[in-house]
Amino acid sequence: MILPNYFQDPNTLHVNTVEHHAYFIPHQQNETALSGKREQSDYFTLLNGQWDFNYFQSYHDLPDNFLDIAFEHKIPVPANWQNHGFDHHHYTNINYPFPFEPPFVPHQNPCGVYHRTLQLTPKHKRYLLNFEGVDSCLFVYVNKQFVGYSQISHNTSEFDVSDYLQAGTNHLTVVVLKWCDGSYLEDQDKFRMSGIFRDVYLLEREQNYLQDFFIQYELDDELRHANLKVETLFSRQPQAIEYQLLNPNGFTVFNQTDTHLNIEVEDIQLWNAEKPQLYTLILHTAEEVIVQKIGFRKVEIKDGILLFNQQPIKFKGVNRHDSDPKTGYAITYAQAHKDLQLMKQHNINAIRTAHYPNAPWFSELCDQYGFYLIGESDVESHGASMLTVKMPEPSILLNHQNDLQTERIRQDMIDNYCYFARDPLFKKAILDRQQANVERDKNRTSIIIWSLGNEAGYGANFEAAAAWIKQRDKSRLVHYESSIYQHSADNNDLSNLDFYSEMYGSTEDIDRYCATAQRKPFVLCEYSHAMGNSNGDAEDYWQAFHRHPQSCGGFVWEWCDHAPYRANGQFGYGGDFGESPHDGNFCMDGLVSPDRIPHSNLLELKNVNRPARAELIDNQIVIHNYLDFTDLADYLTIDYEFVENGVVTSGGNLSVSCKPHSSVILPIELPKNNGHLWLLNLDYRLNTATELLEAEHSLGFEQLNLFSENKLVLPKFTIEKSTFEVQEDHFRINVHNGQFSYQLDKQKGIFSRIEKAGKAIIQQPLDFNIWRAPTDNDRLIREAWQNAGYDKAYTRAYEIQWQQSEQAVEFSVKSAIVSISRGRILTLDIRYRIFNDGQISVEINAIRPTELPYLPRFGLRFWLAKAENTVEYFGYGEQESYVDKHHLANLGIYHTTAKQNHTDYVKPQENGSHYGCEYLKSENLFVSASQPFSFNLSPYTQEELTEKKHYYELQESDYSVLCIDYKMSGIGSNSCGPNLKDQYRLMESEFKIRFDLIFDKTIRQ
């Protein structure tokens, strides 16, 4: 074998690497060091760019003379080779993409050989070659000499290459394998990509250089003074350092020379995510200048409550992968900056680095911009849970109701889950990954919690890891959700873990845990799974978080959809690249699209997490400040407007002082009750621009119904009246006068034709409609819906009676919604009244067998002319809205078209509904109802959205498809979360609704 077998030996993790240490870049001058730009350092040589490249299907194909052969290709560094025509993309969530035989990996293990030259005139210095991220392992050669080996994809591997360099041209060769034994610990839910995906650079250091330093401090009880300590480690022997501290305004606090630092700092300015005040510590050695930003903060737990600077805080967090449709894992400053800016724009204050450390500069940005970080180690072995059990894992492991669920099956899976957590062979690797994470980022202010990893079970290896972290860093807390999954033979020590953490627990789980005094805070490290049209439960979760001081919030799964570009230029998900096994579109579960376009999910979450909330109490507007450290007057201005029957009548703006976690009354005079619908709209706007946000940026909004008993005053119509004639045959009943013509299908009991002045208003017969294109959150209920025949349902009539009066023709229809091979889905008792002015009243009494699954929706489907694709409505808009997902929208008058109303989720599904509507008006149709209704206008049928797998495969209907719904079931987050709550399901055993339809080309008020 040409390559040493290090890649299948868990006892050989690194060969000739520098020990893990804090990340920093030495400079020659203060000016460049203070710039924060490492490229300006004279001691830093970036080796990114086009490298020579050879690709082999297996490392066995690597020729003996691989260091001498010519290179056939070029590849950018950093990059993933799957994005450049080598190998193929592979998405899997849980299952390993290779046989489970730890520590062995397949012989058909793809291999990439990278090469570049470096011109150098070596000095009497040390030269450190850094790789910030390589998947999965690397062998390093300089001038054809083996330098070393390392594995751990998402952390830095550093080699001292001083003794291998020569004057002039130097040849750097790196062999990267797709898999190694470390891949068993890197089974994260993502596209599996390979190669050198983070920066490569060479550092020039002194012979006796500062190798590591650790900044620590203790704050006094008043959080005003700090005892600041800096421990240092030099490569050879201790050396004196000149320490200089600058305050956030740039003024010198102290200047002191010593080997280690121990000094009191008075009148400190604290760091938090709302006000990220950073000090600057400058370390001057004999030849180098090193700059490290410091934020003074204190994180602790008291009485089961998470405190930050002695204030309880809530994580308004997200889980973030490094992911881009074009660059894969290779993320630049600009890409990360865009993510962080979008997060700030949408009220996100915390990030879990799922499920590995990000690039070392990422947390610097979070220090600067103000985010709380859970710094997670590069450990996940979820696939071990599937070792001997192939079942619907999420529903069992997460304790969701399932017909196949048994405690034995669940415990078998958990025992498998803990494989690597208990295996002594992998103890060294698990501990190494914790040490790499902690040592590299230990001086980062924004990292306030260390996480041992993700979905790897619990056992002795993680006990040792948690104990090591607690001994090494007493200033931060330790998190590990998988501690709740323990092997049946174990009784584990959890004393070094500071949180009770769950994934996708329900609001009832939060209430249950917090109902009794607990020593540990409750955190949902993953919740409200953002797959497709999702996050309908965000408001309910935050109501639960706010109910309980012991609940410290959570981290939505996840920030962005994962989808590389396909050859056709469109996004692809699991299975689109010919891979097996795969998990389909389960990677499309982000708040933003792969190219960072916000989904409605993110807009919902933003407003749920708005910094202030208002409510009407005793005819006064009370505002609550949900900020943790900032007075509202220092942060935002409130724009307000009064809306009467959909029309803005007056408004203004104001600033009000309200301390964190407190409430005040807004000095706004309310209108008198005149029986109309009065709404008060509040818009919270940022006072002053920040590094990421512009002044006047909307931080969220509020809408209050000032007189809840009042209803919208609908338009009044003047339409010519004329007596109808009625004609009946075996199949139909025709009703017509000089203007209107209606045809009732006697077999279905519904209108098959509606015309005005000889022009068809509906292009196909109306439908009673119960189906919707399943959302990703319907993936567990979808089978039950289809088994009940909901997707093939149609209407049949049993009895029709009619009578005519001077005012109207009235039909009484007894019918049902049925399906092939199934019994009745709904029993319908319908009364149609066609009035002499052409208006139709449709009164429906429906009875539903309660043994059937809840309904996706119920309503009428209209097939309008393609050209009739513009509507006005009063309801929740402009964004799509649902019974549980309408906090992103306000009630008001809006206009939309069929195309504008449609959202292209990568996997097509229900979208574009609008909740809480009082009326809808198109060119030839006006709809109102006995209660607020939902509607959807789309260029696509629900059948088309159900059938197609990708948005770019959709074929538009020949019609504009309008659905008017009594109710649409909610959205929830059941793709990987709790079942949809009963109050958001259409599950009544009996319900009534009346729709009023007016068909007129020019509707006049």
UniProtKB/Swiss-Prot annotation:
One annotated Gene Ontology cellular component of this protein: beta-galactosidase complex
GO molecular function: beta-galactosidase activity; carbohydrate binding
Catalytic center residues: 455, 526
Catalytic activity, as annotated: Hydrolysis of terminal non-reducing beta-D-galactose residues in beta-D-galactosides
Source superkingdom: Bacteria
GO biological process: lactose catabolic process
PANTHER family: BETA-GALACTOSIDASE
Family stated for the protein in its record: Belongs to the glycosyl hydrolase 2 family.
Protein name: Beta-galactosidase
Lineage of source species: Bacteria, Pseudomonadati, Pseudomonadota, Gammaproteobacteria, Pasteurellales
Gene: lacZ
